[in-house]
Amino acid sequence: MAEPIRPSTVLPANRSLFTLTTADGETLVGEVASPIGNSTGAILCLHPLPTAGGMMDSHIYKKAANRLPAMAGVTIIRFNTRGTTSEAGTSTGTYDGGRAEKYDVEAAVNYCFDVLKVQELWVVGWSFGTEIALCHAKDPRIKGLILLSPPLMKVGESDLAFWAEDGRPITALVPEHDDYLKPD
């Protein structure tokens, strides 16, 4: 009989910490959790607002890294944007409201393709992470975006126009009982 999956369940995976350097010289810390066998795809996780406690270990992303490699064969890549701290460490730099974080997203995407050699990369943003996904995760190698509780406070019309014309899939999820957003 299979064991039930509980909130703290950690399933087998290859896990490794990494650091990467952004184009403007910041050092970011992160973790890759990949399946023991073949990977069917990869997810790059962009965390919630760091000034409100968001980080790579935010519960949804931590649970994804703990389970999806074993359950779905998916590689999970999580990292802290500039000035953000988690168990893995602190990324250098200072939170910049989504502006300089473009270098963080670009460095992480390049790491996924150039170092990890992923083939199928999706970007998942949560809250603030949705904003930096829409603004900065435009690399044509990315297959699509999944947006969790997108506030759309810092996303410009040009960013929305880009994605409207681009044609890659975007899925946006706004929970009915979100602490900050209410679906119309």
Locate predicted features:
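Acidic catalytic loop of the alpha/beta-hydrolase fold
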Residues: 153-154, 176-181
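Conserved hydrolase catalytic core segment
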Residues: 135-144
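Short beta-strand/loop motif that positions the catalytic acidic residue
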Residues: 165-167, 171-174, 178
